Each structure stands twice: as C-alpha cells, then as structure tokens.
Amino acid sequence: MEEPNRILFVSQEIYPFLDVESPIRLRNRQLPEFFQSKGFETRTFMPKFGEINERRNQLHEVIRLSGINLIIADADHPLLIKVASIQAARIQIYFIDNDVYFHRRKGVVDADGVEYKDNDERCIFFARGTLETVKKLRWTPNVIYCSGWMAALVGLYVKKAYADTPFFENAKIVVSLDDQEYMTPFGTKFADKMLVDGVLQSDVRSVAGLPVAY
C-alpha cells in the first residue's frame, strides 16, 4: 500500500486560538483542513502564546511529549507540549510552550506594544521544539510548510541539525514570510544562539555579528 502524503504545518498564528480574525490566521487554519479533506495526513504546530485561553480552547498537556530541555544562550529551557482541536475543521493543533518564552507573554510584543528583546530566542525555541516533537511522534512529513518569521528557522534546522534524521531527510520545505507589522531586528548575537550540533559557523556566517531583520 502506498504511504499517504504527509504535510507538517508550522504556523506562527492560527485562528481561532488568536482571537483577531485575519487573512493569515484564517489561511493557517484552512490549509490543514483542506489537505486533510483530500486524504493527506497533517500535523499542525503553533506557539502557545499567553493570550490563548487554555480552558476555553480545551488545551491539555501531552506528558509523553513534554520534558525535553532545549539549550539556548547557555540556558536550559523545558519544552511543554499541549494539544487542542478545532472541532469544526476536524484538525488537531500542537502547541509549543515554555513558561519563560510563551506561557506568561502575549504574542510578540508587551503591553506597551514593544517587541520582546528575546524574540530571537523564542523563534529558535519554537523551531527546535517543533522538530523535536515531530521526531518523538515518529512521523515523517513529505512537505513542511512554515508560515511567519517565527517558523522561518525550521528549514535551517531540518537541513543541518537534522540532516541525518530519517524523519526529515526527504522533506520539501515551503516558507511563507508574511507581511507582519512588527519589524525590530534581532540582536547581533542571533547567529551564535542558532548554533547546535550540525549547524556550523559557516552556515550562519551571513548574519554573524549583524542585526537581523525578519
């Protein structure tokens, strides 16, 4: 029997978990719904921002997938995985959570509309956390669709850090960098923070020591 086509959706924002309805958030809900209706297997990931109401959206933690520590900027950051369903669309969403990076903070800006200084680390954590979870699920995507700047590093890690991982070796990467309004560049240490086993200085040389606009 032929293996089903599998698409991994890695999205910065999805409606209705983020309340404001926008074309980007609607698209990130509708794409998995459409492909699943056509017989594709899908998995969908997004950050668990603090503004997402866990009770209303019926999120619950998946203990068997949680508990990994990701080292970023020489500090350990526990990875928590939560899930919820969009019943009308018949799709399940996996949420990447961490008390410092996501759980207590709304979106990518603070209450005054100022972007968080560690958005670069949050971006790294989201990308690595998603791939570690897919690996734990032992799920092999044919296509990885990344929406938003917070998902943009997934391709780098798939091709470098996970180059020898069977689950990702044949995956095609599609990146949609949407026109999102927050544009403060990442700091000059972003390249160093991206480094993990498999990602070399030469892989990030083009942004080393520079502020990185996303």
Residue map of PLM features:
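Catalytic cores of nucleotide-sugar-dependent glycosyltransferases that transfer UDP/GDP/TDP-activated
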Residues: M1-Y214
